[in-house]
Amino acid sequence: MASQYPVGEVSTVLVDHIPVVWMEPSPRRPEAPLALWLHPLSRTKEDAIPFLQDLAGAGFVAVSFDAWQHGQRGTEVRDHILERVFGGFRRHMWPILGQTTLDALRVVDWAIAELEASPEVVAGGVSMGGDVAVALAGVDERVMRVASIVATPDWTRPGMHDLNDPSRVLPQGQADAYARWFYDHLDPLTHLDAYARGPAIAFECGADDTHVPPDGAQRFQAALSEIHPHVAERVCVTVHPGVGHLDGVRSAALLQNCMAWFLER
């Protein structure tokens, strides 16, 4: 992807307890727009660096961080994270989504204060990272645009199939009180009024994605249309034929779509 601006070096810092990575246009531009980009389950902030470079080249202060229990904040190898989470999805996934959403608030605060980024924020991510970005838009009015790839606003993920065995529907398990708190406060589909201000949200979905089915995004848009029709008009759900979950995770074309969505600001 061609860069409009020269890009500085990759920088890292601990923001409180949160390991952050960022890139900026070089030289730094005052009030450059802030872009937050988040990684999928079991990955790390380093996986976001190639797209951070593209975002910085497009003029954004581009930031990512390790999700809760991931990267520098984790103690498990990738396969163990996946095994634990999909062995008890609601008990383990909901706190990861919730804590990471709250951490995103802190990172946005830091980036605006310390990097002098604009308070008009765009946010996005892949799979779990996209889930978090959508949730963040429901609690942070600075987030004006969201772009998500193979992600969902429905944390219950009905019809979620095993990535390794698409014929198998994954059991959700039960949430404990701790996990339930995050769902009760942050799940986008059950907090539609949090989106009444009308952030522009793009869902890039795969028609063949049985792990994060596109109907979650479609139901979110339909539910918004019933109570906030003007808001639903700012939600764009694109279902790409022949694209499965892992196809979407790896897709350069979908990243380009997200970039175009951000640049419409």
Annotate each language-model stretch with its function.
Residues R73, Q218, A222, E226-R265:
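C-terminal catalytic histidine-bearing segment of alpha/beta-hydrolase fold enzymes
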Residues L41, A207-D209, G242-G244:
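Acidic beta-to-alpha connecting loop that harbors the catalytic carboxylate
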Residues E83-L115:
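Alpha/beta-hydrolase active-site loop
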Residues M23-E76:
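Short, surface-exposed "cap/lid" segments of acyl-processing enzymes
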Residues T156-L224:
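The feature captures the conserved acid-bearing segment of alpha/beta-hydrolase catalytic domains
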Residues M1-P30:
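N-terminal cap/lid segment of alpha/beta-hydrolase-fold proteins
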Residues D66-H70, T152, V243:
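Short beta-to-alpha linker loops that shape the active-site pocket of alpha/beta-hydrolase fold enzymes
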Residues L105-D165:
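Primarily recognizes the serine-hydrolase "nucleophile elbow" in alpha/beta-hydrolase
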